[in-house]
């Protein structure tokens, strides 16, 4: 009986100590041990020995199975996540738009801009100068007709008959008026004075008043003639076609860069409210837009941003080099800290493994003692 009990105790001790030692040898010793030139077996422990390999494998596992573009994309497009981000963005936008700060102070605090109005004007002037140079540089191979929007070309051509009618109406009204008749008399006098002998001969036979009385009805008749309308319409059409065929570069001499920049600056200062908004509190001028921004623009912006992120996830994760980050972090993690972490999580399980070893050892001791008794 004592033999059986002794063998059970010895087996249990051996089994428990063996399993406990095996668990310890997962982490210890932390470094290689030597006696002279000879390295002791099983040093360092399993995890310290495979630390770098473990870091590499963890990096691969994280990239391949844990942090993937598919998983992140699925999370980003979940309705709950999208709704929470949208609500947060709405709150922040309302908070920003109702702020007492001005655009000038925000630019100064966040971007160290001392004179925001001067900066805006400088940027607009630079943009106008660049656009002017680029537009006329590209104009070398283009005509006015090519540069004009099609809607403008169509509108001009559609209104040419109206322009013709307006010109003829104005001309008829002017010629038929007393002012027009007086101007005709002046023109006849000027004509006779500048044509020497011919003018003197005409003056001998016809007085100025008589010439006006003769020419005035004929001029009105000419202006009311349908052929005159056709002639004027053809003239307008031809001039319009000639204008469209002119190179864009031809108009550069009439449009100076300095004038364009000056007019743009004046319009910005007097007509565009941004300049006036710069020094005012945000809530003073954003009130009419707050609801539209928060309820319409922000949700659309959130949706577009999330879709853009999802479409670029593969590229972003590749550029982040997550595998390398995980490998470096795990490699930098001390084995002592790793041991504490694993034991804090699995201490109960490791104890059960030790007890299981003792139980198996005790069972083996019992079997051995019974075999010995049978042999005797």
Swiss-Prot record:
GO cellular component: plasma membrane
Pfam families attached to this UniProt entry: DUF445 (PF04286)
Membrane topology term: Multi-pass membrane protein
Chief location of this protein within or outside the cell: membrane
Subcellular location as annotated: Cell membrane
Top-level taxon: Bacteria
Organism (species): Halalkalibacterium halodurans (strain ATCC BAA-125 / DSM 18197 / FERM 7344 / JCM 9153 / C-125)
UniProt xrefs under InterPro entries: DUF445, UCP032178
Cysteines joined through disulfide linkages: none
Alphabetical UniProt keywords: Cell membrane, Membrane, Transmembrane, Transmembrane helix
TM region positions: 3-23, 355-375
Record family assignment: Belongs to the UPF0754 family.
Name used for this protein in its record: UPF0754 membrane protein BH1148
């Amino acid at each position: 009986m004592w033999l059986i009990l002794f063998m059970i105790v010895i087996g249990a001790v051996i089994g428990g100590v063996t399993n406990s030692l095996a668990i310890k040898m997962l982490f210890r010793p932390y470094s290689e041990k030597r006696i002279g030139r000879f390295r002791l077996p099983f040093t360092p422990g399993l995890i310290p020995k495979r630390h770098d390999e473990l870091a590499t494998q963890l990096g691969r596992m994280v990239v391949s199975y844990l942090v993937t573009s598919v998983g992140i994309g699925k999370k980003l497009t979940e309705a709950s996540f999208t709704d929470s981000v949208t609500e947060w963005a709405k709150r922040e936008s309302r908070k920003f738009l109702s702020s007492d700060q001005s655009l000038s102070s925000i630019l100064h605090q966040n971007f160290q801009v001392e004179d925001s109005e001067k900066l805006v004007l400088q940027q607009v002037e630079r943009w106008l100068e660049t656009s002017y140079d680029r537009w006329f540089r590209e104009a070398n191979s283009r005509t006015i007709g090519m540069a004009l929007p099609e809607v403008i070309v169509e509108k001009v051509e559609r209104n040419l008959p109206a322009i013709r009618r307006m010109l003829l109406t104005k001309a008829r009204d002017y010629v038929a008026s007393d002012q027009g008749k007086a101007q005709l008399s002046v023109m006849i006098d000027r004509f006779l004075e500048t044509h020497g002998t011919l003018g003197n001969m005409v003056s001998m036979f016809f007085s100025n008043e008589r010439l006006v009385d003769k020419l005035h009805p004929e001029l009105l008749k000419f202006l009311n003639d349908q052929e005159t309308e056709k002639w004027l319409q053809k003239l307008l059409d031809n001039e319009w076609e000639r204008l469209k065929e002119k190179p864009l570069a031809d108009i550069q001499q009439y449009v100076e860069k300095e004038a364009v920049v000056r007019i743009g600056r004046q319009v910005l200062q007097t007509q565009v409210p941004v300049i006036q908004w710069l020094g005012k509190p945000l809530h003073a001028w954003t009130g009419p837009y707050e609801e539209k921004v928060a309820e319409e623009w922000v949700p659309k912006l959130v949706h577009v941003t999330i879709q853009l992120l999802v479409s670029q996830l593969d590229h972003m994760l590749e550029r982040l080099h997550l595998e390398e980050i995980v490998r470096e972090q795990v490699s930098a993690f001390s084995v002592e800290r790793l041991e504490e972490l694993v034991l804090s999580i699995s201490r109960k399980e490791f104890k059960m493994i030790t007890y299981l070893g003792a139980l198996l050892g005790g069972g083996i001791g019992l079997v051995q003692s019974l075999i010995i008794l049978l042999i005797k």
